[in-house]
């Protein structure tokens, strides 16, 4: 959901002042401008003040739009379809301001937006936990499998009576 900084592409404080109009604020949403146009990140306190690079574009939600709700919408298949449809470029998909303005956002009242965002955070955290536990189980199972094979082929386990 957040932004991972790339220290290899930093700018000097002086240059950052020249780029003040591209400075990100908490609640902004950063989208990839080229290629994978369906990727986005929500600017949090840690990335507040970063400068948006030229291969990305920042959306600043309007008053009445909950940033987390907008970010979750951008994760949806409906948003992905619209972004792909309105993107430009024959070889590499690209987004511009015109394409973004054409995307239709279902916009309930602010309280409902907050409820939707909270619900999705709660449910996806549970799913992410289950995925992590499953991945850990798979890794342990692979280790167990490897140890079992090693033990069987080195004679540490007598398999003659098991087959």
Label each region the model flagged.
Residues 13, 58-60:
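Short histidine-centered catalytic/ligand-binding loop motif
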Residues 36, 49-57, 65, 88-114:
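A short glycine-rich beta-alpha junction/loop motif
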Residues 46, 61-64, 77-78:
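Short loop segments at secondary-structure junctions
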Residues 42:
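A short, polar/charged loop-to-alpha-helix boundary motif
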């Amino acid at each position: 959901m957040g932004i991972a900084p790339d220290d290899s592409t930093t700018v000097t404080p002086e240059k950052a002042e020249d780029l003040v109009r591209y400075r990100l604020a908490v609640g902004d949403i950063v989208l990839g401008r080229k290629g994978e146009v369906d990727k986005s990140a929500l600017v949090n306190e840690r990335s507040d003040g970063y400068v948006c690079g030229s291969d990305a574009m920042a959306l600043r939600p309007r008053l009445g739009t909950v940033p987390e709700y907008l970010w979750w919408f951008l994760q949806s298949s409906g948003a992905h379809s619209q972004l792909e449809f309105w993107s430009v470029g024959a070889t590499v998909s690209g987004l511009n301001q015109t394409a973004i303005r054409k995307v239709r956002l279902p916009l309930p009242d602010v309280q409902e937006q907050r409820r939707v965002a909270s619900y999705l955070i709660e449910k996806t955290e549970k799913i992410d936990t289950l995925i992590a536990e499953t991945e850990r189980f798979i890794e342990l199972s692979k280790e167990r499998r490897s140890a079992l094979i090693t033990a069987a082929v080195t004679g540490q386990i007598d398999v003659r009576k098991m087959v």
